[in-house]
């Protein structure tokens, strides 16, 4: 496979696993388009205006079928793109092949090494004939950090970055505080139609899908610990309970802990549950959540996985000297000196993309419609965005939701003038204040 990829690199402006998967990828892209009404509506609305004409976007998001629909939407709106994946295991090779076959510069394949991962990101920042980006589209912050640290000369021409996920947003705010952020950023993650849909409903479906594909384990009757009760943790806990698991939550935030308790979950500590739970899921965006000491206490055949962005929530490094037995791609048994076995999924990286195909197309349409609108905002209205971290305005958040209602058979009630005046809003919205918590 590696030889095939190197040959492709020398002859084409892409680096993927297998171009022969392109037809399969194209069929799945066409199916996904029917489930992504937000992106298709933007194509229809802007196909003639081309609001991204002149934009050169370097993108770093999981190279999935749904991302392919996003990329082709950006291009139909006038942009040029170069793309890599933000995770070494998350690429769907048939999706990458379908885009590469159309001449789109894609640098991603499932199972990259760390070195190859960073080489792919670097490839998105430099193209033929002096091509460099003037916009970034990121997931997790690696592309942004790499640009700032390794290519500071590019920053003066970059109008901004739109960031997809919680982890990347945390990094942006840290960069802003430290003074190292050199261009504006739009925090797509905190759009309501992203965090309350992708993070919650997406994880509610994709976590179970990945655990089932990886292990074939019966969820019902199992004791499962979900570490973190933010939107991602909430979605995971809901699906696990729906399948019949007894769910325990660990939390640092008293508000989230109280929410979990009021939903009927037991709020516990890892130290308390390490020796008795069957499945452990980390969903915190933090580091050292499951330590080596915790794993020493776990029982034989316990399953350990992560649905946070990076691989540092579980101390995988501490297991490297033990015997690893690969069961199938991204599923390993780690055998401890005493003979105990732990099932480690996706080497502690994003389990829903390492062991399955990620979130369904419909919920990703929400997220990616926000991404397109953020890119248009940064490109069309740079004067509105000095260096800082912003969220999309409320009226655009509501518009994203509106574009998806028909697909689920939902009909809106329309305010009368009297009703709108009574609560002090425009009949067309926005309907909630900026600080409203959905």
From Swiss-Prot:
Its main location: cytoplasm. It is found in: Cytoplasm. It catalyses: S-adenosyl-L-homocysteine + H2O = L-homocysteine + adenosine. It comes from the Bacteria. Pfam families: AdoHcyase (PF05221), AdoHcyase_NAD (PF00670). It is an enzyme of class 3 (hydrolase). The keyword NAD applies. Its cofactor is NAD(+). Pathway: Amino-acid biosynthesis; L-homocysteine biosynthesis; L-homocysteine from S-adenosyl-L-homocysteine: step 1/1. NAD(+) binds at residues 165-167, 199, 228-233, 251, 286, 307-309, 352. Belongs to the adenosylhomocysteinase family. HAMAP family: AdoHcyase. This is Adenosylhomocysteinase. It comes from Coxiella burnetii (strain CbuK_Q154). The lineage of its organism: Bacteria, Pseudomonadati, Pseudomonadota, Gammaproteobacteria, Legionellales.
